[in-house]
């Protein structure tokens, strides 16, 4: 039966919602994917994520092919052309099919009179493709990052910035977290081998396994039974560092979507865990993850800057603060971050992080452990944040993660390793 929808027009609308309305792709896509097949769902995701990953290159190509950009109500057709270009450059979709479906998107978007224009631009690109892509390599669009972020990464990592950009521009690896309540990691690796799924263990993080080739979760042995969870290796490092113990009172702050909450309980099933997040909608994901893994935690809505409103005078043995951040370490998973973030956001986020860590510090027992973590690679949110905190609090002692002069541990994104992540483990003396 022929599909009644046009994927290219759906992708163009999704990209419009990201770039013109400031919505995240992860918020936009689920609604748009509701009535389409699993196979087409994967293609839609590829068209959206891929187009946003290489946006500057596609934008530059359009500038060479069109006298003036499409604006206002016609902007969505600008994105439709981008989706067409992405298919021609980066996918194995036969060019005639890519063109036909993209051009037909104009009819679905109720501007059939633009079909000729869109067809003409895409065919012109086909004729000039080799020359245009060679020229694109010689300008800043080649880096596929906004100029403000490129400048910050170069400044922070003068010797490594190129590798960071390369990692950001690649598809992310698929990491699993083995539930140690069901199997050891070596046992689960054997199950993967039996299922003809190639995988390897992480050299540092004890529950982490990388799939050599990503696959759908329904192909993973025991996924529905809670034997395994999809979670990046660097994110798993937070709980390894926290080292939760049975019987302890543990706070997971900024907990949604619940990956770290459930990891804490897999590591210490008799711990008493309070999971708190300011976003009530995202907390439903925490509950879903707890349910799938058959784990129990108290889940509450709350602002990290006002802990008295959600925990009263309760104190904790361990606190995991996965602070709100720029998410510049997970760009390869969420390429829309490059276009949703602004330079001014960084200082605002650093201020918010400072307010949260100050507010939550009194809730940690003496002798207790706080792990501060972000999925950022920017020093203002990480080393500088922790250096300032240690200066304000002589009773705070850094352990296992750097020195007072160079506080914390910074992971950078790597094609065969985890995302960009920062950790600081602090004991209250």
UniProtKB/Swiss-Prot annotation:
One of its GO terms (biological process) is rRNA base methylation. Its EC number is 2.1.1.176. Pfam families: Methyltr_RsmB-F, NusB, RsmF-B_ferredox. Keywords: Cytoplasm, Methyltransferase, RNA-binding, rRNA processing, S-adenosyl-L-methionine, Transferase. GO terms for cellular component: cytosol. InterPro entries: MeTrfase_RsmB-F_NOP2_cat, MeTrfase_RsmB-F_NOP2_dom, NusB-like_sf, NusB_RsmB_TIM44, RCMT, rRNA_ssu_MeTfrase_B, rRNA_ssu_MeTfrase_B_ent, RsmB-like_ferredoxin. Its main location: cytoplasm. One of its GO terms (molecular function) is rRNA (cytosine-C5-)-methyltransferase activity. S-adenosyl-L-methionine binds at residues 254-260, 277, 303, 322. The active site is at residue 375. It catalyses: cytidine(967) in 16S rRNA + S-adenosyl-L-methionine = 5-methylcytidine(967) in 16S rRNA + S-adenosyl-L-homocysteine + H(+). It comes from the Bacteria. NCBIfam families: PRK10901.1, PRK14902.1, rsmB. Belongs to the class I-like SAM-binding methyltransferase superfamily. RsmB/NOP family. This is Ribosomal RNA small subunit methyltransferase B. It comes from Yersinia pestis bv. Antiqua (strain Angola). The lineage of its organism: Bacteria, Pseudomonadati, Pseudomonadota, Gammaproteobacteria, Enterobacterales.
């Amino acid at each position: 039966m022929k599909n009644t929808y046009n994927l290219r027009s759906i992708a163009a609308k999704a990209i419009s919602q990201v770039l013109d309305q400031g919505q995240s792709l992860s918020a936009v896509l689920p609604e748009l994917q509701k009535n389409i097949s699993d196979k087409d769902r994967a293609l839609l995701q590829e068209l959206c994520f891929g187009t946003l990953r290489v946006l500057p290159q596609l934008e530059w190509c359009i500038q060479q092919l069109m006298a003036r950009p499409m604006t206002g109500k016609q902007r969505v057709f600008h994105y439709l052309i981008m989706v067409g270009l992405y298919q021609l450059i980066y996918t194995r979709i036969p060019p005639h099919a890519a063109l036909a479906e993209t051009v037909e998107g104009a009819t679905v978007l109720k501007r059939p009179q633009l079909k000729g224009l869109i067809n003409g631009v895409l065919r012109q690109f086909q004729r000039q493709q080799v020359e245009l892509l060679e020229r694109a390599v010689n300008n800043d669009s080649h880096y596929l990052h906004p100029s403000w972020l490129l400048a910050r990464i170069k400044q922070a990592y003068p010797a490594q910035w190129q590798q960071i950009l390369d990692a950001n521009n690649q598809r992310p690896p698929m990491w699993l977290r083995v539930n140690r309540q069901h199997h050891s990691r070596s046992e689960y690796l054997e199950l993967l081998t039996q299922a003809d799924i190639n995988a390897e263990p992480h050299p540092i993080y004890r529950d982490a396994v990388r799939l050599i080739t990503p696959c759908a979760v329904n192909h993973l042995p025991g996924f529905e039974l809670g034997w395994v969870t999809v979670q990046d290796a660097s994110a798993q490092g937070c709980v390894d560092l926290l080292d939760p113990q049975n019987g302890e009172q543990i706070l997971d702050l900024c907990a949604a979507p619940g990956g770290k909450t459930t990891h804490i309980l897999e590591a210490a099933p008799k711990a008493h865990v309070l999971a708190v997040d300011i976003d009530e909608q995202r907390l439903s994901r925490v509950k879903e993850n707890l349910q799938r893994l058959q784990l129990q935690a108290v889940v509450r809505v709350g602002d990290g800057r006002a802990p008295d409103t959600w925990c009263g005078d309760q104190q904790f043995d361990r606190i995991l603060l996965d602070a709100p951040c720029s998410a510049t370490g997970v760009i390869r998973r969420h390429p829309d971050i490059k276009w949703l973030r602004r330079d001014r956001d960084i200082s605002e986020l650093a201020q918010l992080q400072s307010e949260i860590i100050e507010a939550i510090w009194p809730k940690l027992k003496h002798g207790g452990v706080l792990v501060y973590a972000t999925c950022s690679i920017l020093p203002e949110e990480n080393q500088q944040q922790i250096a300032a905190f240690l200066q304000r609090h002589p009773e705070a002692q850094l352990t296992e993660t750097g020195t007072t002069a160079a506080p914390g541990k910074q992971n950078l994104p790597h094609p065969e390793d985890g995302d960009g992540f920062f950790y600081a483990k602090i004991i209250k003396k």
